[in-house]
Design a protein with these regions (language model features):
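Acidic, metal-coordinating catalytic segment for phosphate/diphosphate chemistry
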Residues: 2-39, 45
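Nudix hydrolase/Nudix homology domain
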Residues: 24-26, 63, 101-109, 113-187
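The catalytic Nudix box helix
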Residues: 51, 68-100, 122
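A residue-level structural signature of the nucleotidyltransferase/glycosyltransferase Rossmann-like core
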Residues: 10, 48-49, 140-141
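Short, catalytically relevant binding-site loops at active-site mouths
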Residues: 56-58, 72, 104-107
């Protein structure tokens, strides 16, 4: 089970992604401070993206569907190392991750929480069956890029803000990179 991470010290950044200090995770999300984050899209051998339904007990966006894994590097931690760590903690898998693109977004999430993130988006190949931590993940699904788009269009309130943001603003990149990872899986 994942430990309580509410007071982890996360990396504050400026608009150019330069480290500008640190603060506790809860305080950052209450105040909407700009901070460093990552998101991961894990792709299976059939080219489908592993998506997760967040645990209803999460401090924000509980019960909503999101990409494979997301999180924050801790103060002093490299972003790629944090991404690998969280992939194991949340999904119970390891994967060689490749950088895909940067994303930047800001949103009020309700419940007094705000996202204001500079995000490193990584892609990886699923090599073993996920073993999700139930404290983090309520359910998982393997969906094609087109299936995800249809589901978001049909029921947008079932998805996290950031997942919809990625598909709206980086959809072509996600489709291209997921296809590349899928081709590597077939080799």
């Amino acid at each position: 089970m994942t430990r309580n991470t509410s007071e982890e010290q996360l990396i504050l950044v400026d608009e150019r992604n330069r480290a500008a200090g640190s603060a506790g995770k809860t305080a950052i999300h209450r105040a909407g401070l700009l901070h460093r984050a990552f998101s991961i899209f894990v792709v299976d051998a059939r080219g489908r993206i592993v998506v997760q339904q967040r645990s209803p007990d999460k401090y924000h966006s509980g019960g909503l569907w999101a990409n494979s894994c997301c999180g924050h590097p801790r103060r002093g931690e490299r972003t790629i190392a944090a991404a690998r760590r969280r992939l194991g903690e949340e999904l119970g898998v390891t994967s060689a991750l490749s950088f895909g693109f940067f994303a930047r977004y800001q949103a009020a999430l309700g419940n007094g929480m705000h996202e204001n993130e500079f995000v490193y988006v990584y892609f990886g190949r699923l090599k073993s069956a996920p073993r999700p931590d139930p404290a983090e993940i309520a359910d998982i699904a393997h969906l094609s890029f087109d299936d995800i788009g249809r589901r978001i269009a049909r029921d947008p309130h079932a998805f996290t803000f950031w997942f919809k943001h990625y598909f709206r603003n980086h959809g072509a990149e996600i489709a291209r990179l997921a296809e590349q990872v899928s081709r590597l899986a077939a080799m």
